[in-house]
Amino acid sequence: MQDRQKAQDYRALLLADTPLIDVRAPIEFEQGAMPGAINLPLMMDDERAAVGTCYKRQGADAALALGHRLVCGDIRQQRLEAWKAAYQRFPNGYLCCARGGQRSHIVQRWLQETGIDCPLIEGGYKALRQTAIQATWQLAQKPILLIGGCTGSGKTQLVRQQPNGVDLEGLARHRGSSFGRTLNPQLSQASFENKLAVELLKINARQTLKRWVLEDEGRTIGANHLPECLRERMAQAPIAVVEDPFALRLERLREEYFIRMHHDFTHAYGDEAGWQAYSEYLHHGLFAIRRRLGLQRFAELTDTLDRALAEQLSSGSTDGHMAWLVPLLNEYYDPMYRYQLEKKAANIVFRGTWQEVANWLKAQ
């Protein structure tokens, strides 16, 4: 316990996936948390708000007294039992509040009264957050190689196969396009950045890193945006472009968006509700780009999508989806990406099929 109390090497704590018993209010946790943290609040949102109002009007002593009145009796005991259970499950864990102040110290003292010595994070979440921001800035200074290519080129798979690859879309829980959402909701911006920082630290720690391999992304991946320090470095980075046959790209997209997403939705929600969610997911993706398609073209593709869904529901075949996917690629996604890539033409260092790019990466 004493050694752990003194061991406030924040990077080491993040690298080790150290369990954190985060006693901040749920709203604070949702706004930003560290990977591996579990939220077991000392005060719920309404209790925290009441204490905050009391602090502004009557001062610190009155606010502290109100906090103890709000968290007492059965409520206090229930929360204490939850903290005890968490520590028993994660005996190498740490208590964490916003700044390592009263909340984590109060919980620590209450646990000590039951015979449990649980260390706390000095400086709290704010200190860990600052460490994550600094780590991302520092590690983003290393050389970067981008993997580019049109939709369906298998870029994400290629990045994942690299020992120095960072799957930005996986971290963001989004595949980048209007159809990119997954069944897992995206994290808050701060939580995404924290998760990215920990991933960079881990990859950097386990090898002699010459450079990062990242997918060529825009500023945003769904609702998350890339840290500006990383985005600036990516804008200057060399690019290896995957140029696979159109038919192969279609098969990848069929597998990812029509077969796998249908499976994931039905597995999560059951056949009927899963099918409805899958259908709404595809319609939402098309609806999101309706203005760029033009309303007439959007209506035409929506009708084609409806027919494709009816065919898939009745026969299980996904062939009908090609009738709207092919024009969507030809008229929207491919021209858009090629226009963006043309602006970065000076950064392109290699072009080839997926396998040729994979072989080229190995030779670097």
UniProtKB/Swiss-Prot annotation:
Indicate the segments forming the Rhodanese domain, all copies: 14-137
Q: Which residues form a coiled coil?
A: none
The membrane-spanning stretches of this chain are none
Q: Keywords, A to Z?
A: Selenium, Transferase
According to its UniProt record, which reaction does this protein catalyse?
5-methylaminomethyl-2-thiouridine(34) in tRNA + selenophosphate + (2E)-geranyl diphosphate + H2O + H(+) = 5-methylaminomethyl-2-selenouridine(34) in tRNA + (2E)-thiogeraniol + phosphate + diphosphate; 5-methylaminomethyl-2-thiouridine(34) in tRNA + (2E)-geranyl diphosphate = 5-methylaminomethyl-S-(2E)-geranyl-thiouridine(34) in tRNA + diphosphate; 5-methylaminomethyl-S-(2E)-geranyl-thiouridine(34) in tRNA + selenophosphate + H(+) = 5-methylaminomethyl-2-(Se-phospho)selenouridine(34) in tRNA + (2E)-thiogeraniol; 5-methylaminomethyl-2-(Se-phospho)selenouridine(34) in tRNA + H2O = 5-methylaminomethyl-2-selenouridine(34) in tRNA + phosphate
Please report any disulfide bonds recorded for this protein chain, giving both cysteine positions.
none
The active site lies at: C97
Q: Which HAMAP family match?
A: tRNA_sel_U_synth
Query: What does this chain do?
Result: Involved in the post-transcriptional modification of the uridine at the wobble position (U34) of tRNA(Lys), tRNA(Glu) and tRNA(Gln). Catalyzes the conversion of 2-thiouridine (S2U-RNA) to 2-selenouridine (Se2U-RNA). Acts in a two-step process involving geranylation of 2-thiouridine (S2U) to S-geranyl-2-thiouridine (geS2U) and subsequent selenation of the latter derivative to 2-selenouridine (Se2U) in the tRNA chain.
What's the protein called, per UniProt?
Answer: tRNA 2-selenouridine synthase
- Its source organism is Salmonella enteritidis PT4 (strain P125109)
